[in-house]
Amino acid sequence: DYLIVGAGLFGAVAAYRAARSGKKALVIDRRPHTGGNAYCEEREGIRVHKYGAHIFHTSNREVWEFVNRFVEFNNYINSPVANYKGKLYNLPFNMNTFYAMWGVTTPAQAAEMIDRQRHEAGISEPRNLEEQAISLVGIDIYERLVKGYTEKQWGRDATQLPAFIIKRLPVRFTFDNNYFNDRWQGIPIGGYNKLVDGLLAGVEVRCDTDFFADRTHWESLCDRIVFTGRIDEYYDFRLGELEYRSLRFEHETLDTPNYQGVAVMNFTEREIPYTRIIEHKHFEPGGDQPRTIITREYPAPYEHGAEPYYPVNDQRNTKLYESYKALADRDRKVIFGGRLGE
């Protein structure tokens, strides 16, 4: 009944729901494993997030109860730290951040500092991302914690990026380092692989299988396709190619039990080529292994053959995506979903 292209979280949930409703589903994935970008592998007794950090969080009770049918979650709270030229700041922007930056100790002092810088900038109609960010949080936070990180992420100067990329920058006037506001968060005990394996139990799965290598064959097998890859690739780029950004992950095993003391540290100066370092053992309790594994995350331009990780969010890309979405809305054969499909 269903061919599901992509064995990540969206594809796995689609397969589970199809099976539960009495439909037959076949899941294919060109990678040698299931789980998509949430896939983990174990090294040195440490569960490594192979494609970057993934922290599950939701305020939807139905979603939380659903995933807990398959796996329990630990009590990990995402509290990343930003490193700017060797000085550390808590994220998201909160009273700990403002104390480290200005020495202020009360919410009123912090709010006054931010408001003063916003008004000194005198930006009423931001023309680009830089002006938008400064108009929201002032020059100090922008220069130290937003500018370099954002420019590395998008591969462009902040003055060349559209203002609408940043709708808001969350500012908290409490000493709360919890990055998310959601009711529930955590990491699956046993890893995301355990969650995905539970979702795919009893479903036929074929890895190392490329949909586009024999598209006619795969399309002939099913009534509907659930597609979690690139929407423009599905339609043979007939309207043009969407622009994506890629990532490169550099994994390293170190002869120290604790490298940075936190799971995620962002490096916000432009001169450091990576955006963050992940120390995987801190995602789970314990962490008493004699060695540690870190991953440096490097943003990169997308080139054919590389992995597209996220779309470039500018006016051209958004307009082109809307054209592809209009095609999809008229297409009764396919359902798009997932990070790339949507």
Give residue spans per PLM region.
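N-terminal Rossmann-like FAD-binding beta1-loop-alpha1 element of flavoenzymes
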Residues: 2-27
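Short loop/edge segments at beta-strand edges and connector loops
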Residues: 6, 77, 205-210, 338
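Short, solvent-exposed loop/turn segments at secondary-structure junctions
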Residues: 9-10, 32-34, 96, 151, ...
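Glycine-rich FAD pyrophosphate-binding loop
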Residues: 19-44
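Dinucleotide-binding Rossmann-like beta1-alpha1 core, especially the glycine-rich loop
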Residues: 44-120
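Active-site/ligand-binding neighborhood in enzyme catalytic cores
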Residues: 85-89, 95-224, 228, 235
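Mid-domain catalytic core of redox enzymes
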Residues: 212-322, 327
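Short FAD-binding loop at a beta-strand-to-alpha-helix junction that anchors the flavin cofactor
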Residues: 328-342
